[in-house]
Amino acid sequence: MTFCYPCRAFALLTRGFTSFMSGWPRIYYKLLNLPLSILVKSKSIPADPAPELGLDTSRPIMYVLPYNSKADLLTLRAQCLAHDLPDPLEPLEIDGTLLPRYVFIHGGPRVFTYYTPKEESIKLFHDYLDLHRSNPNLDVQMVPVSVMFGRAPGREKGEVNPPLRMLNGVQKFFAVLWLGRDSFVRFSPSVSLRRMADEHGTDKTIAQKLARVARMHFARQRLAAVGPRLPARQDLFNKLLASRAIAKAVEDEARSKKISHEKAQQNAIALMEEIAANFSYEMIRLTDRILGFTWNRLYQGINVHNAERVRQLAHDGHELVYVPCHRSHMDYLLLSYVLYHQGLVPPHIAAGINLNFWPAGPIFRRLGAFFIRRTFKGNKLYSTVFREYLGELFSRGYSVEYFVEGGRSRTGRLLDPKTGTLSMTIQAMLRGGTRPITLIPIYIGYEHVMEVGTYAKELRGATKEKESLPQMLRGLSKLRNLGQGYVNFGEPMPLMTYLNQHVPDWRESIDPIEAVRPAWLTPTVNNIAADLMVRINNAGAANAMNLCCTALLASRQRSLTREQLTEQLNCYLDLMRNVPYSTDSTVPSASASELIDHALQMNKFEVEKDTIGDIIILPREQAVLMTYYRNNIAHMLVLPSLMAAIVTQHRHISRDVLMEHVNVLYPMLKAELFLRWDRDELPDVIDALANEMQRQGLITLQDDELHINPAHSRPLQLLAAGARETLQRYAITFWLLSANPSINRGTLEKESRTVAQRLSVLHGINAPEFFDKAVFSSLVLTLRDEGYISDSGDAEPAETMKVYQLLAELITSDVRLTIESATQGEG
């Protein structure tokens, strides 16, 4: 084989270098690696680069780093060896040519700043591309890697953010010394040099373009990891005060309250002090260490899924708005911790004003929290200041997080969304000048929620305890084994794309000065909010605790033998794996037996042993609390549960009749649990579930009819029980509506709750959400939307009775009698 003189010369030089590595260079790297191995404890992003980025270790891999740093190179080497990736210090031999496995894009700071030796990286890129020209089977994977020691964004001082953070030797020494344990090695998706060579050629101009694109990539990556510079707080306040919207609101405040302009302005500043975050990188670092120590002792693992899609959006310059579900006060800390360890900037977080107590308030402020009141009504100055502050965060490029539910879910299900902050987000777009805003729905799940006992008390009528230092200390003192945590990033929603599709002329409403409320805003915000809730549920996470709770609560006596529980978990797992709820949902890879062992370690269940085997029991006092975890995944199992309930009741039923029954009840289920399917998608989903239930032996399919299989009736009955309480609630409301067609919505909600409470006592229903006000309010609204009830309160008796008769077949006769007798004043 022949190749060019420079390649032969480089090959000879590299061979000499390799043999020389046994001498002084090897000693140099060993000496340098000794302090680095002590000072540097870096983390890899993603956690397991090869499978997460699709790297093929059987094909050649070369690494591209932003600038020349031996400390960075050795830090990269440590992570490569830890993850079974090729050693960057080992040269690549391709067709007899030895090439270094790493390329520095920039030579780093030098004494003579006009000398920037970029030619070396361009030459190496050209050599690699040239080898692809001569060898059509060659495909080198080029992996961009950036190593970061610390991620302080700095404060605004007028200078432009540098595209790369180049440190000289002394600066690098202190960075390693001080920030070695706050360092990250960020692997990016690989670039195929074969594709580059085939599509763009192999000449030197392509190599130059490759180097230029790599520099831009690293600059964007640093901005995504560090974020824009932070403003001085007083400068931010001065800018807000100077805005036309706040200036006008201050004038209105002075006029309406008959106070001086200076006093009104002081009121505005006081509101800014109340609202604004005071972000501190040092507090982030300190909290990261504390949380890292705490999580390792409290949690057995934090499971993160689909983070790469978020990193890519941040890299592409999107303004990220994180919209998680709200389970616990722990959500604030957990999500920021996860984002930080995924190489993303911790967001500014909209926190309830109830958390602004000492010392939590000042700490949360420094971690990025800005505080929001429960209501803006009657305070125009406050709403204007808050809206302008939120708009300023967007215009400066800071990521933001808020809980669209408005508060923590007390039932474990998603709450109906509160749209105020979401509306302000879209209004910020209507000011113009912001980067593309993308909403990121996030499902957060736990195997133990520390507030779950308090939630159950509140649902039964107890007054919510005000957040305070003593309450916080009591909560912390109870923290024990919390099991696993789950953070699943759902399908992002680019707002600009959404508006282009649904409100094509939205740009006509842009006003850079005044906050506008075009006619399309409210319905569009409501639709976006509902879509977000669906996407959050799409990213649901099944785990050992919620699966075991679902099975045990389905049993009449809240107990199953270990064999029965294993059988039931296998039923759930096979349904979720073979007919996935969505591509974003996650199901444990562990076996049913392993999940049961893990759940038993949480000390929520009791085990009775006899000569036959183990009986796993959910104690009565725990049953109410465990409904919370069951409800976390209710949406993932409700459709197969409904099908099982219908088949169990009828013993055998045709597909068409089954489809009719599901079609009648599905709108209520969809609205209550934010289910993902539209009605026209149901036939395919029901067919897939029926086929899976047949595969499991739960039913048989004969002549297009579904028949129960007596040999496997128990798992089918337990599966059906998952829909039992929901169907009972629907039966209550439809019976009341049938008995009194002229009943108004408020009375219907109230009487439905009263009957539900009665049913709960008489029939031992443990779920506190069974008579939750919000659940019945949502149901009645759905009945209005579906035409069962009008705004005037008139119902169509024939239609409501028809639905009630369908529901009456799916509930037990004693429950039906209790419901029907309640309206007649009987016991």
Curated annotation (Swiss-Prot):
GO BP annotations listed: CDP-diacylglycerol biosynthetic process; fatty acid metabolic process
Membrane topology: Peripheral membrane protein
Motif HXXXXD motif: where in chain: 325-330
InterPro entries for the chain: GPAT/DHAPAT, GPAT/DHAPAT_C, GPAT/DHAPAT_LPLAT, GPAT_PlsB, Plipid/glycerol_acylTrfase
Domain notes: The HXXXXD motif is essential for acyltransferase activity and may constitute the binding site for the phosphate moiety of the glycerol-3-phosphate.
Localization: Cell inner membrane
Gene Ontology cellular component annotations, sorted alphabetically: plasma membrane
Reaction(s) this enzyme catalyzes, per UniProt: sn-glycerol 3-phosphate + an acyl-CoA = a 1-acyl-sn-glycero-3-phosphate + CoA
Gene Ontology molecular function terms on file: glycerol-3-phosphate O-acyltransferase activity
Annotated Pfam families: Acyltransferase, GPAT_C
Family statement drawn from the similarity comment of this UniProt entry: Belongs to the GPAT/DAPAT family.
Metabolic or biological pathway: Phospholipid metabolism; CDP-diacylglycerol biosynthesis; CDP-diacylglycerol from sn-glycerol 3-phosphate: step 1/3
Keywords: Acyltransferase, Cell inner membrane, Cell membrane, Lipid biosynthesis, Lipid metabolism, Membrane, Phospholipid biosynthesis, Phospholipid metabolism, Transferase
Name by which UniProt lists this protein: Glycerol-3-phosphate acyltransferase
Domain of life: Bacteria
NCBIfam families registered for this protein in UniProt: plsB (TIGR03703), PRK04974.1 (NF003441)
Chief place of localization: membrane
EC number per UniProt: 2.3.1.15
SMART domains: PlsC
